Regions:
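Mature extracytoplasmic domains of secretory-pathway proteins
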Residues: 51-93
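Extracytoplasmic
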Residues: 18, 26, 41-45, 70, ...
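Polar/charged, Gly/Pro-rich intrinsically disordered segments
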Residues: 88-131
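Short N-terminal segments immediately surrounding and downstream of signal-peptide cleavage
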Residues: 18-36
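Short, compositionally biased low-complexity segments
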Residues: 40-55
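Sec/Tat signal peptide C-region and signal peptidase I cleavage site
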Residues: 13-17
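Sec-dependent N-terminal signal peptides
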Residues: 3-12
């Protein structure tokens, strides 16, 4: 468990130091965390969780279709390069999530707006999968 937490901190460190992560919509996006040790429906899954305040149901300016383009971008340009730096098996699936506020993984948070997309990794690219 300690090794997983250390790896998550190492992977998250550059994003936190850089602050905002560029996405096509231009909305402000920051990394909340990366979760490696929870299995998904496709087997080993890496979850990259981001904070994107502009998706908020009340007062947000980014709709789901725009956010979906941002999630595709985050998978291909942010998550994939970090998968290549891990030790051990490569995840079969990447889940990208956006939330308008920080949320605890696995805890129902009705006040949060959250979007999720799942991707298979094929030929070095993220391929959207129905979730």
């Amino acid at each position: 468990m300690r090794a997983v937490l250390m790896l998550m901190t190492w992977l998250a460190g550059p994003a936190m130091a850089q602050g905002l992560i560029a996405v096509p919509s231009g909305q402000p996006v920051t990394l909340q965390d990366v979760i490696w040790n929870e299995p998904g429906p496709a087997g080993l899954t890496a979850r990259f969780r981001f904070i994107a305040p502009e998706i908020a149901h009340d007062g947000g300016s980014i709709d789901f279709d725009t956010a979906a383009t941002d999630m595709d971008h985050l998978c291909n340009t942010y998550a994939l390069p970090r998968l290549d730096t891990t030790t051990g098996p490569t995840p079969a699936q990447v889940v990208i999530s956006l939330s308008d506020i920080p949320v605890t993984f696995g805890v129902i948070t009705p006040e949060a707006t959250q979007f999720f997309e799942a991707y298979a990794i094929r030929d070095g690219a993220c391929v959207w999968e129905p979730f």
